[in-house]
């Protein structure tokens, strides 16, 4: 068991028609570095990090923590999904008074964009989450300027709760669940 309470981690790999969501492995390291060094991927996430810094900082097996999925296509990592990071109470955007909601995050390599992989992978992760922690809301926060992410949020069924300024940009905050937001 982990800090997820009754949820054992890692789960068995989650398989869709073409994708596998799994725990990270050593063979994923180069793709992790590419994700964090990519100006395209990091446009709305604080910008790219220097590749030489990443080569030094990224561990041999990156991303090994509860709630972190590698998205693989034909065995190769094309992206990541985080699902069990709990939203900090000091940050804006919550659907529960006590905060601590699970927050969906995702990054995909540019060559995987426009193929529907993000929608399929996120939907599979959300289905897993709903089975593992029934009734728990999932939140998502993205810059309103990020058209691809806004489209994905709508496609996944997230409902807008509010918009606010954070990190120097307007943020869209939504929830995926039957939970009614407070406020």
Residue ranges of each PLM-predicted region?
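GNAT-family acyltransferases
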Residues: 1-111, 124-128, 132, 137, ...
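A short helix-loop-beta submotif of the ANL/AMP-binding
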Residues: 112-119
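Conserved G/P- and acidic residue-centered "switch" motifs that form tight phosphate/ATP-binding loops
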Residues: 75, 116, 146
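Generic domain-boundary/flexible-linker signal
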Residues: 92-94, 115, 149
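Conserved active-site alpha-helix within GNAT-family acetyltransferase domains
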Residues: 119, 145-160
């Amino acid at each position: 068991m982990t800090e997820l309470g009754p949820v054992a981690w890692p789960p068995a790999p989650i398989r869709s028609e073409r994708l596998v969501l799994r725990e990270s492995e050593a063979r994923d390291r180069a793709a992790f570095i590419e994700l964090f060094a990519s100006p395209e991927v990091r446009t709305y996430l604080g910008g790219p990090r220097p590749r030489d810094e990443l080569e030094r900082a990224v561990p041999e097996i990156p991303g090994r923590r509860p709630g972190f999925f590698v998205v693989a296509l034909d065995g190769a990592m094309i992206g990541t999904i985080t699902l069990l990071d709990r939203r900090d109470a000091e940050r804006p955007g919550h659907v529960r008074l006590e905060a601590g909601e699970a927050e969906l995050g995702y990054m995909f390599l540019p060559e995987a964009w426009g193929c529907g992989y993000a929608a399929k992978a996120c939907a599979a992760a959300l289905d897993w989450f709903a089975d593992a922690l029934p009734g728990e809301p999932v939140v998502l926060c993205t810059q309103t300027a990020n058209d691809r992410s806004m489209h994905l949020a709508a496609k996944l069924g997230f409902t807008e709760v509010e918009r606010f300024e954070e990190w120097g940009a307007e943020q869209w905050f939504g929830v995926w669940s039957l939970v009614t937001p407070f406020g």
